[in-house]
Amino acid sequence: MDFDEVLREVGSFGLYQKVIICSVLLPAALPCAFHAYSQLFIAATPQHFCRVPELEPWTQDYVQLVKNLSIPRNRNGAYAECSMYSRNYTDIVRYLEYRPPPDLLRQQAEDLLKLQPDTTQVVPCQHGWHYDKSIYSSTVVQEWNLVCDRSFLVTLALVVFGVGGLLGNYVFGYLVDLWGRRPSFYAYLLLEIIACAASAFAWNYYTWLGLRFVVGLTVPAILASPYVLAIELVGPERRVFCTIVSNIAYSLGLVVLAGVIYIVRDWRELSLAVSMPLLMLFSCFFVLPESPRWLMAVGKTRRAIKILKVMARVNGVRVNRDFVERLQRKLVITRAAETKSSMTTHYGILDLFRGPNMRRKTLIITLIWFANTSVYVGLSYYAPALGGDEIWNFFLAGAVELPTYLLLWPGLSYFGRRWILFISMLVGGVACVATFLYPDITLLLYCVGKMGISSSFVVLPLMASELYPTVVRGLGMSFSSVISMVGPIVIPMINHMGQQMLVLPLIVMGALLILGGFASLLLPETRNRNLPQTLEEGEAVPLSFLLCCCVESERKPNNIRASPKKRILPEAGTPVFHRVDTPVSDRVPCKIVCSICKNEMRTL
């Protein structure tokens, strides 16, 4: 049974859907943004230098003096963060005790540095570190000294968070079909709030790491649940709208998170600030309906009909008296057909790779999905490392997404999916790579790259859902999205490698985007096309192969003969047409076969 027909009878986008989406589903996008990226500031690394116990009395008031006495400089002239001078600081302390403050400020330790100019050795920090608290009053890095040879533990926390997301995305696919959309969402939300709030009371790094893993388990589910519910409550003509609005809500969550971080600078307080207010979402538990589409799919017809009646009443639609009878009759027929089909056909992941066209489309979609997820998460993680005000950079990273979605909305309706996906990824990739040539405008190029990846991140799931056949659509979407979650595991390591070369992660992410952009040209356009229902229909839709000859030939009349020209051998890589005459008569039609996509066209 086509549920979209049922929605048209009760109102596919009326007051009921608008109230649910605006009051519940859009605010529900905030937890994902909060918990996915608050860790960047909970585990922020402030400026630091080696602690020298003998110079401790002067550290607070004469920081520059203490650094000159104890800290060497790097090649770029900055003070080292992981090394110090090995000196007899007892003699220096005796000298400092008898110097008045004005003399100390004036001399800047020039005389003291001459005491041991040749014999001074540089050694790693021996007694811990002093941290700059002008930006953050406290972070996990400060509390557990996750710097220097322990700095990789910060990256490890992001990797573990990504592993949790990978597993959570896999488990959520089962729970959402087993429990339903609403119970799954609130179960994950409760687990997320408890784990994030508990991490504020962690007593060591590994306890905090384990709790962040649990938070990572819930983030994909929290992100997917509002989107799935919104899509299933509206008609097909409003799904692009729901996709855009859902992403706008997510970007607003990033902007709001930047404001929360600006106010709360202690990591324990920040963990509570991004978790406890989300308990207010439970006040909507009895307002948010279960998906009637899912209820019908699992045979809970009475609950589905009850929700549909409420939907019709709120939307101001009067349904016919025989509405319930017709609906139940359709359900019986549909269930019998599905039972018969399930007895003969079972689909698995291998079905995505049986036919050559489906295999290629699955691999291309998965590659592009991996590139999108990796670069989007990577650029969001990279924002605080751009230099300058870290919180302002993160605010910009979220704010630049908002105008992108407003421009994308009409573009998807008038220009299609394929070219918008290609242009978005190409522009974003070129902007990221260009930071190597124009380092002075890295922030501007970063914003352009973020706008590009934000656009493609919206288009790809929509295009993928229109390319996978109905019988394996959910399976194909899950497969591609799960594989793409490897990106958030790998990308923190690339960002960690970029500590010595700031633009290195941007170059890697830009190259990945460009590769995915050109791969998107191999996919066929899906705008205004009927969705494939079976594997055979999906296999019959050929790849596009950039500017395939078959696409151009559709615009030309078949009965016009080209004027005879001198025969020229085609260049390598260009499509070649093979004429295959049938030996029936001299006037029979012939087949023109494209050598690239193997699509046959009949002409005179």
UniProtKB/Swiss-Prot annotation:
Keyword presence, Transcription regulation: no
Organism taxonomic ancestry: Eukaryota, Metazoa, Ecdysozoa, Arthropoda, Hexapoda
One CC-aspect GO term: plasma membrane
Protein name as it appears in the record: Beta-alanine transporter
Membrane topology, from the record: Multi-pass membrane protein
Similarity comment: Belongs to the major facilitator (TC 2.A.1) superfamily. Organic cation transporter (TC 2.A.1.19) family.
A biological process term (GO) from this entry: histamine biosynthetic process
Annotated organism of origin: Drosophila melanogaster
Residues with glycosylation annotation: N68, N88
Extracellular-side positions: 45-151, 204-212, 265-268, 384-390, 440-442, 495-501
Pfam families: Sugar_tr
Keyword Transport: yes
Tissue specificity as recorded in UniProt: Expressed in the head and predominantly in the retinal pigment cells of the compound eye.
Record keywords, A-Z: Amino-acid transport, Cell membrane, Glycoprotein, Membrane, Transmembrane, Transmembrane helix, Transport
GO molecular-function term, one example from the UniProt record: beta-alanine transmembrane transporter activity
Function recorded in the entry: Beta-alanine transporter required for the uptake of beta-alanine by the glia. Required for the recycling process of the neurotransmitter histamine in photoreceptor neurons of the compound eye and therefore for photoreceptor synaptic transmission. Following histamine release from photoreceptors and its uptake by glia, histamine is conjugated to beta-alanine by e/Ebony to form the inactive metabolite, carcinine.
Record topological domains on the Cytoplasmic side: 1-23, 173-182, 234-243, 290-362, 412-418, 464-473, 523-604
Subcellular location: Cell membrane
InterPro entries in the record: MFS_dom, MFS_sugar_transport-like, MFS_trans_sf
TM ranges: 24-44, 152-172, 183-203, 213-233, 244-264, 269-289, 363-383, 391-411, 419-439, 443-463, 474-494, 502-522
Database matches in CDD domains: MFS_SLC22
